């Protein structure tokens, strides 16, 4: 049996964790930035982004990748990807944000988990997403039910 590690999906391991030097540089800024408190599901997604489990993603999908995954099950660069990895936020929070703005993603206890630079904001067509990704609109399907009933109506890429 080989001890070699398989190559990450897409050929590149993305693990966008801050090193100690960068963490010290942004530490003071964190208190000044707008914050979003992550849901349990969002926290799982950001952990997989940060530890490389969602390589080659280095953040939440932008609208182009989201649309491509919903239509073709592939990222915009044509790499196979089965489901959108998105950050849904409330409209009221989205209204306060600008493209290229940095925000802090926090856990429920208020600890800063990640910094996100807003690449884009959009209102997804969740019915279309459910149909293309889950191939059903039946809310007995847990993915469809969660998407249609528990996600906010604005997605943010970054």
List each language-model region with its residue ranges.
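Non-catalytic terminal extensions that flank enzyme cores
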Residues: 1-158
